[in-house]
Amino acid sequence: SLSAAETTMNHATALSTYVEALNTHSWDRIAPHVGADAVFIFTEDTFIGHAAAKAAFEKTFKLIENEVFSLHDIVWTVVMDDVATCHYEFRWKGLISGQEASGGGRGTSILRKVDGRWLIAHEHLGPYPRK
């Protein structure tokens, strides 16, 4: 059964709650926010479903210690009863081999409402445009 917070959560709150979960670096905390057949398109590959996504996220968490991931300038382009899509700038910072590192780019997310809960259905993260 859903908590009161989950049933009243809208698409925007669901996205920010997902980002909070990402910053725990725990797949067990992230997974409840991700659809079973979610697609993640990252620079290195495309990952479909929980098992593939878990492996990709855990590889990143090992590579970037203490990573903090954030979204900026979120624009919701389509919001319907059970689907919402947005684009944004993402940023990350952390330690790679003990050295401070950071980066970012542009992203698109599609959330789908499943059994009353907004879940990540699709996430595409890519570089900033070449100037």
What is each model feature region?
Residues 87-94:
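Generic short beta-strand segments
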Residues 4-5:
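Boundary at the C-terminal end of the N-terminal hydrophobic targeting segment
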Residues 104-131:
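Short beta-strand edge/turn micro-motifs at domain boundaries
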Residues 70, 101, 105:
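Exposed loop/turn and edge beta-strand positions of beta-sandwich/beta-sheet ligand-binding modules
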Residues 12-14, 27-82, 88:
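A solvent-exposed, acidic/Ser-Thr-rich amphipathic alpha-helical stretch
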Residues 96-98:
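Outer-membrane beta-barrel domain signature
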